[in-house]
């Protein structure tokens, strides 16, 4: 059976009080609508249509070709929004999932179960529900005395007894696609808001003797719709708890989960320890037995086994096995550290390959460079890679010793097994097995200050 999905992402989100459109606000480092789309895809949907309106181009830029798009010029309610997908789906067979783009906590497992329940019961519509102590703001699930679904009533249209009901509609539905688009033509806007409500499709199906089901999720957090900054922070907290719990259940020690922020695409090996205040995002892979010290930040990087990261920032880089970074080091994009490499305190590395066993222990800048195996870069040494217009490369061979406070003026090559005296400014290539000195000779004038 064909499976389709419609993601509702046309709203501006005025309660956010933001220049950014609502569904593009991030949770765990990713726009809410992207979380939704990823989970819809994993649920086994063949085709996705995203309804866009406010911020249409920004939403399309975010989701790219992972979705088809339909434009809703005026936001006249959820049924009106779904109707906009007519051009792509009206003649299709199968099941259509409708999900809101501001529900970043929904999981693909729940969506999958909803679809399977809908199809196995041969229903025309199935609504995803949940129960909560505080149902304010949500549509209520109205059942008859036999527990059979009768209708969904919106908060603003509910009477006092209906508002007391704790089971609420998530706003997520599975429909028989043909029935959905047939009934959308019959929906009217005679309600308190003057809008076309998607739950009215359910009422029309029931009125004509169709079959409607409810699938209830036990985790209310999954269906949280984010409408303001407070709810955004609640969604962030809930998703971080879920992510951190997953990693801890799979062998990772997180000393203080409440202050640790890990993205959804991060992979972490067993027996890795993460101290408080750490942020790990993007497509980062951390292997086994890694120690990540407090307040470190790692993005889109690979950290190999037994590495030790202390209070450092790492972006788009690779750290080899048994390497040590920090404290207070920065690896900028393109940094590649081999095994047993040490990058110490207040060292900045950018677009550089530092080979196995090399050391850059303190107060240095290594940019656009290649540092050979077991080479030692002394304190305060820098690669001078920029002339104001272009970047140039520095190559240092293996087993070299670069004295403290050395300036390597690129482009320059330092051979294997060389020694550069402290305080030198190197402008020419150095052959291997050489000693290089490039500094003024010291002159002492005794008694000068007694004059």
From Swiss-Prot:
Q: Which residues form the signal peptide?
A: none
The cross-references to Pfam families, in alphabetical order and at most eight, read: Hexapep (PF00132), NTP_transferase (PF00483)
- According to its UniProt record, the EC number is 2.7.7.23, 2.3.1.157
Q: Which residues bind acetyl-CoA?
A: 385-386, 422, 439
Region: N-acetyltransferase; residue ranges are 251-451
Please state the pathway this protein functions in, per its UniProt record. Answer: Nucleotide-sugar biosynthesis; UDP-N-acetyl-alpha-D-glucosamine biosynthesis; N-acetyl-alpha-D-glucosamine 1-phosphate from alpha-D-glucosamine 6-phosphate (route II): step 2/2; Nucleotide-sugar biosynthesis; UDP-N-acetyl-alpha-D-glucosamine biosynthesis; UDP-N-acetyl-alpha-D-glucosamine from N-acetyl-alpha-D-glucosamine 1-phosphate: step 1/1; Bacterial outer membrane biogenesis; LPS lipid A biosynthesis
Keyword flag Disulfide bond: no
Q: What are the record's GO terms for cellular component?
A: cytoplasm; membrane
Subcellular location, in the record's words?
A: Cytoplasm
Q: Where is the active site?
A: 362
The GO terms this record gives for MF are: glucosamine-1-phosphate N-acetyltransferase activity; magnesium ion binding; UDP-N-acetylglucosamine diphosphorylase activity
> Which pairs of positions does the record mark as disulfide bonds?
none
Amino acids binding Mg(2+): 102, 227
Question: Positions of the region Pyrophosphorylase?
Answer: 1-229
Query: What SUPFAM superfamilies does this protein's entry cite?
Result: Nucleotide-diphospho-sugar transferases (SSF53448), Trimeric LpxA-like enzymes (SSF51161)
Catalysed reactions listed for this entry: alpha-D-glucosamine 1-phosphate + acetyl-CoA = N-acetyl-alpha-D-glucosamine 1-phosphate + CoA + H(+); N-acetyl-alpha-D-glucosamine 1-phosphate + UTP + H(+) = UDP-N-acetyl-alpha-D-glucosamine + diphosphate
Report the cofactor remark.
Binds 1 Mg(2+) ion per subunit.
| The family this protein is said to belong to | In the N-terminal section; belongs to the N-acetylglucosamine-1-phosphate uridyltransferase family.
| Assembly and oligomerization | Homotrimer.
What name is this protein filed under? Answer: Bifunctional protein GlmU
This protein's gene is called glmU
């Amino acid at each position: 059976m064909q499976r389709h999905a419609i993601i509702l992402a046309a709203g501006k989100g005025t309660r956010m009080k933001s220049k950014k459109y609502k569904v593009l606000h991030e949770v765990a480092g990713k726009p809410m609508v992207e979380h939704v789309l990823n989970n819809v895809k994993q649920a086994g949907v063949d085709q996705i249509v995203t309804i866009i309106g406010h911020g249409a181009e920004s939403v399309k830029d975010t989701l790219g070709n992972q979705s088809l798009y339909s434009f809703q010029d005026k936001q006249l309610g959820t049924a009106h929004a779904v109707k906009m997908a007519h051009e792509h789906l009206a003649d299709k067979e199968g099941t259509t999932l409708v999900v809101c783009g501001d529900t970043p906590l929904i999981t693909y497992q729940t969506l999958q179960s909803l679809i399977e329940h809908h199809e196995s019961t041969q229903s025309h519509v199935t609504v995803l529900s949940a129960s909560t102590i505080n149902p304010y703001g949500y549509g209520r699930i109205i059942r008859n005395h036999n527990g059979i679904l009768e209708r969904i009533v919106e908060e603003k249209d509910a009477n006092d007894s209906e508002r007391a009901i704790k089971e609420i509609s998530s706003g997520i539905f599975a429909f028989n696609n043909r029935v959905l688009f047939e009934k959308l033509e019959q929906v009217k806007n005679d309600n308190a808001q003057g809008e076309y409500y998607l739950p009215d499709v359910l009422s029309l199906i029931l009125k004509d003797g169709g079959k409607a089901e409810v699938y209830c999720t036990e985790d209310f957090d999954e269906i949280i719709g984010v409408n303001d900054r407070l709810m955004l922070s609640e969604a962030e907290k809930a998703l971080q708890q879920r992510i951190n719990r997953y990693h801890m259940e799979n062998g990772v020690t997180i000393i203080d989960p409440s202050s640790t922020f890990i993205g959804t695409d991060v992979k972490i090996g067993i027996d890795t320890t993460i101290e408080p205040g750490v942020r790990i995002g993007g497509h980062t892979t951390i292997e086994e037995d890694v120690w990540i010290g407090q307040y470190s930040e790692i993005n889109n990087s690979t950290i190999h086994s037994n590495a030790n990261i202390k209070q450092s920032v790492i972006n788009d880089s690779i750290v080899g096995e048994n390497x040590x970074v920090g404290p207070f080091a920065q690896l900028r994009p393109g940094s590649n550290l081999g095994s047993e490499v040490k990058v110490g305190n207040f060292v900045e590395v950018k677009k550089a390959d530092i080979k196995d066993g090399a050391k850059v222990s303190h107060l240095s800048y290594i940019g656009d460079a290649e540092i050979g195996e077991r080479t030692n870069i002394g304190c305060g040494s820098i690669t001078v890679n920029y002339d104001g217009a272009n970047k140039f490369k520095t190559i240092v061979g293996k087993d070299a010793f670069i004295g403290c406070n050395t300036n390597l003026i690129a482009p320059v090559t330092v051979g294997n097994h060389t020694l550069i005296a402290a305080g030198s400014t190197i402008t020419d290539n150095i052959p291997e097995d050489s000693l290089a000195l490039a500094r003024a000779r010291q002159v002492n004038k005794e008694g000068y200050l007694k004059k």
